[in-house]
Amino acid sequence: MNKLALYCRPGFEKEVAAEITDQASHLGVFGFARVQDNSGYVIFECYQPDEADRLARDIPFNRLIFARQMMVISDLLEDLDPADRISPIVVAFEELSQQVNFAQSSELFVETADTNEAKELSTFCRKFTVPLRQALKKQGWLSAKASQKCGQFLHCFFVKPNCCYVGYSYVDNHSSHFMGIPRLKFPADAPSRSTLKLEEAILTFIPRKEENKRLNENMIGVDLGACPGGWTYQLVKRGLFVYAVDHGKMAASLHDTGRIEHCAEDGFKFQPPKRKKVDWLVCDMVEQPSRISLLIGKWLLNGWCRETIFNLKLPMKKRYQEVILCLENLAVMLAEQNLNFDIQAKHLYHDREEITVHIALKP
């Protein structure tokens, strides 16, 4: 058990490789990443046995930026017999179970990478799931309750019709979504598809049980670069009154709610109205990430907001390095003013050449 598989958006394999190498080294674990461009996944191989399991436990998954899923895997199973793929897969799971008790496992995902080529296997994976699940249940696995806070999900990751990895992820340190992708439905009345980015961000960064407390009708939000209103829509839907800042036009449907005030101003120059306590700042402006970071820092340092979600666009080559630099600079700015804060960043499914960042100031 010396390998991890990490899913990602195709084209971001190098960022995942750099990130997992950094995170592993912080724990004193060393290895190397196997990267295939545009494959949608990375294999990280540790030099020492059993260290992949340690990484899957000890690297906080919600602190990984570019990985959609993290799991311990077997060696690649190749040349599977189409007449009986299940037997060698069960044997591979049995070998893994000698180190990990799969009696605590609750779910099986038969997956592929998120590429057009791999998606051709999706119908097969869906049909293969039922007989494989039955075979694994005969081993006494997959019997734990899905609501439990410990245990594992079992994964069968097909890279070709006759080649797969088998593995597991920890329930308390993984993505609970199939392929690491949340399935969100585009609201028919939303002004733009960008609304799904903020919806996914809220689902990712804000615990469900806290959402009504942290986003409600008693709060005020500001949306910088709001036009036509995809992000504003998500705040209004949750009851906030929103100052929508943009020279462009906002969707008429948002004006009809009576919950927005359109401010035709430059997002970099706008300041919140005096005597108004702004709770939330959101921002999806197309600008250099270093400039956006400084803008967000200004809002937090001036006490203009308490919580923010914003995007950093990443058109450059050294994307991982740029992200780390921006996040470190923001952290230093806030720490120097003795502010307590929590910062998270994620390359969301609905993000493209960008990441989404969440910062919350604490009392």
From Swiss-Prot:
What this protein is called in its record is Ribosomal RNA large subunit methyltransferase M
Per the record, the major location class is cytoplasm
Q: InterPro entries, per this entry?
A: RlmM_FDX, RlmM_THUMP-like, RNA_MeTrfase_FtsJ_dom, rRNA_MeTrfase_M, SAM-dependent_MTases_sf
Q: How does this chain assemble?
A: Monomer.
Q: HAMAP family this protein is in? A: 23SrRNA_methyltr_M
State the family it belongs to. Belongs to the class I-like SAM-binding methyltransferase superfamily. RNA methyltransferase RlmE family. RlmM subfamily.
| GO molecular function terms attached to this record | rRNA (cytosine-2'-O-)-methyltransferase activity
Q: State the function annotated in the UniProt record.
A: Catalyzes the 2'-O-methylation at nucleotide C2498 in 23S rRNA.
Top EC class, one word: transferase
Cite the Gene3D superfamilies for this sequence.
3.30.2300.20, 3.30.70.2810, Vaccinia Virus protein VP39 (3.40.50.150)
Organism superkingdom = Bacteria
Q: Name one GO cellular component term.
A: cytoplasm
Give the reactions, separated by semicolons, that this protein catalyses: cytidine(2498) in 23S rRNA + S-adenosyl-L-methionine = 2'-O-methylcytidine(2498) in 23S rRNA + S-adenosyl-L-homocysteine + H(+)
Name the catalytic site residues. Answer: 313
**EC code:** 2.1.1.186
Query: Any idea where this protein resides?
Result: Cytoplasm
Q: Which UniProt keywords apply?
A: Cytoplasm, Methyltransferase, rRNA processing, S-adenosyl-L-methionine, Transferase
From the UniProt record, give one GO term of the biological process aspect: rRNA processing
Gene name of this polypeptide: rlmM
Organism of provenance: Haemophilus influenzae (strain ATCC 51907 / DSM 11121 / KW20 / Rd)
Task: Give the residues the record marks as binding S-adenosyl-L-methionine.
Answer: 194, 227-230, 246, 266, 284
What Pfam families does the annotation carry?
A: FtsJ, RlmM_FDX, RLMM_N
